[in-house]
């Protein structure tokens, strides 16, 4: 029997390069395999490592990064967000793709401009109010690192060290992954672990959606203890669990175990606990009993006392869950919009006004108060995103035509502050007619007040970023946003200002707006007390493009040049 020797792949490859004219089986396949690049797997040192739960630093956005959408006229960032308000990268890519299409095709702009495309400049996706993250199962192939972290934490629940068990139970609650093996491990340690670990395991089980009678009884026991800090943590975890539970439709909700025993305990805490614990207990009871008069009265009292953040919690429950749209609630919303120091709370107040609607506001006799406050917030709000949200609310409440009439009339006010407020308001309300646009251009040339001039330039730049008609009109106009020097020199009109002689003097402040070519955003870097060195000696004439226009008497200048020439001749 003949023995056929198998061909080694290395011999085939070697013969293929040495004798390419030879024919042998699978020559094409071997050639393709030999020419293909070799991708070696990453070593254990090159593999990216990630730890769950991650450090809080990785959730924070730095204002210098492009995703934070910095305000394009001030050094301070436009938006600071928390970890749950992170910008969706996919939405940003879709928006940029749509904007490129808009710039390339003017006809497409005219068709879509009246719809959602005009809102792409808004950075409000960072401020969108999202419900709390619900617990969910996790597939091993979906996120291998997180799956590995879950396995490690569940093993840590069996550790002989109490601190490791406590940390593992706490971390599993932060991850919000309700896989079967996680729930079983938590239930096991809740029955057999130390008292401290039992407390945290039951709290994590509630957060992950397990609200059976055993968990509720353990939570009731913790709520009855005298430790105020532990009671507050239990109430916070219970509120998070009930918030996720109430977000599910009624036909798909699971029954809360021993609900009849939990309700009296919460009612007692509302009456006898501290203000913060009483509020948390009222919020928990509000999810269980949305029609409770006791909870409604207590939350209405909270609107008039306590911190602004606590008042906002009460407002969310009253407006979104209990659907109470009374006059005190509307006034509390306006108070949050006017004086809250939290950016997200001011933004959410505008959304609450949309939810209530104009009819309810008119029925409570608060239409004039609401109109005046919204009009004020279109110019005195420091953050552009909130001003744009206010403008959207004005349009939703059908108050925009009246407000536009007042703002446009205010442009001719002799008071510079009033004119500046009107200009800033138009930046978010929009320019609705060519007459108003040309009026703004005339004001830009005739305005002597530097702050008003700067606001005019910013408004035109902002409107050009969303309106192709305005962008086309400003095509060959350079808008220089100048910092007013602290001198007594009278500011010159824009048309007589010298253009910067050096390209280094132009500072593009916002790269995204710089993409709106040929619209340029410039800022002169002229410091007080700093003299510029002339580009040409006094005896030489400047090129035509560098000559400034005549802005004053010219005879003294000629005499000065003749005097310099005479001194040089000596």
Curated annotation (Swiss-Prot):
Q: Name one GO biological process term.
A: response to cytokine
Q: List the coiled-coil residues.
A: none
The UniProt entry, under InterPro entries, shows: ARM-like, ARM-type_fold, HEATR9
What PANTHER family does the database record attribute to this sequence?
PROTEIN HEATR9
Protein name, entry field: Protein HEATR9
What organism does the UniProt record list as the source? Homo sapiens
Q: According to the entry, what is the taxonomic lineage of the organism?
A: Eukaryota, Metazoa, Chordata, Craniata, Vertebrata
């Amino acid at each position: 029997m003949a023995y056929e020797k198998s061909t080694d792949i290395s011999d085939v490859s070697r013969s293929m390069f040495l004798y390419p004219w030879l024919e042998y089986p699978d020559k094409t396949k071997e050639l393709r395999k030999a020419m293909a690049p070799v991708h070696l797997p990453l070593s254990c040192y090159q593999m990216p490592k990630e730890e769950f739960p991650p450090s809080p630093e990785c959730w924070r956005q730095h204002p210098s990064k492009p995703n934070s959408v910095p305000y394009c006229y001030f050094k301070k960032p436009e938006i600071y967000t928390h970890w749950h308000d992170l910008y969706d990268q996919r939405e940003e890519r879709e928006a940029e793709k749509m904007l490129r299409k808009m710039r390339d095709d003017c006809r497409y702009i005219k068709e879509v401009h009246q719809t959602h495309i005009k809102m792409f400049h808004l950075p409000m996706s960072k401020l969108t109010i999202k419900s709390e993250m619900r617990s969910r199962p996790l597939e091993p192939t979906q996120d291998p690192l997180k799956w590995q972290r879950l396995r490690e934490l569940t093993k840590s629940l069996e550790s002989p060290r109490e601190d490791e068990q406590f940390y593992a139970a706490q971390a599993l609650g932060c991850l919000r992954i309700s896989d079967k093996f996680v729930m079983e491990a938590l239930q096991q340690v809740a029955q057999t672990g130390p008292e401290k670990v039992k407390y945290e395991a039951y709290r994590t089980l509630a957060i992950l959606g397990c609200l059976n009678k055993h968990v509720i009884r353990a939570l009731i026991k913790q709520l009855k203890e005298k430790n105020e800090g532990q009671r507050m943590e239990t109430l916070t975890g219970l509120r998070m669990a009930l918030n996720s539970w109430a977000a599910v439709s009624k036909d798909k909700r699971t029954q809360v175990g021993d609900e009849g025993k939990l309700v009296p305990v919460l009612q007692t805490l509302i009456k006898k606990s501290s203000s913060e614990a009483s509020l948390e207990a009222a919020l928990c009871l509000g999810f269980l009993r949305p029609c409770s008069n006791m909870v409604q009265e207590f939350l209405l009292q909270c609107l008039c006392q306590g911190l602004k953040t606590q008042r906002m919690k009460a407002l969310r429950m009253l407006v979104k869950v209990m659907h109470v749209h009374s006059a005190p609630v509307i006034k509390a919303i306006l108070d949050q919009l006017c004086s809250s120091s939290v950016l997200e709370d001011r933004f959410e107040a505008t959304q609450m006004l949309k939810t209530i609607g104009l009819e309810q506001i008119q029925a409570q006799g608060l239409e004039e108060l609401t109109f005046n406050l919204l009009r004020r917030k279109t110019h005195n709000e420091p953050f552009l995103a909130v001003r744009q949200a206010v403008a959207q609310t004005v349009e939703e409440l059908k108050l925009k035509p009246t407000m536009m009439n007042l703002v446009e009339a205010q442009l001719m006010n002799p008071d510079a502050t009033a004119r500046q407020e009107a200009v800033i308001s138009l930046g978010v309300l929009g320019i609705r007619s060519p007459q108003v646009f040309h009026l703004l251009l005339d004001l830009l040339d005739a305005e002597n007040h530097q702050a008003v001039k700067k606001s005019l330039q910013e408004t035109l730049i902002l409107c050009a970023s969303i309106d192709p008609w305005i962008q086309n009109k400003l095509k060959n106009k350079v808008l220089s946003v100048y910092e007013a020097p602290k001198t007594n020199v009278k500011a010159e009109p824009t048309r007589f200002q010298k253009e910067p002689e050096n390209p280094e003097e132009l500072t593009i402040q916002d790269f995204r707006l710089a993409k709106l070519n040929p619209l340029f955003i410039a800022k002169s870097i002229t410091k007080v007390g700093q003299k510029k060195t002339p580009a040409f000696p006094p005896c030489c004439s400047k090129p035509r493009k560098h000559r400034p226009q005549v802005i004053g008497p010219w005879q003294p200048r000629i005499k000065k040049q003749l005097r310099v020439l005479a001194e040089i001749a000596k």
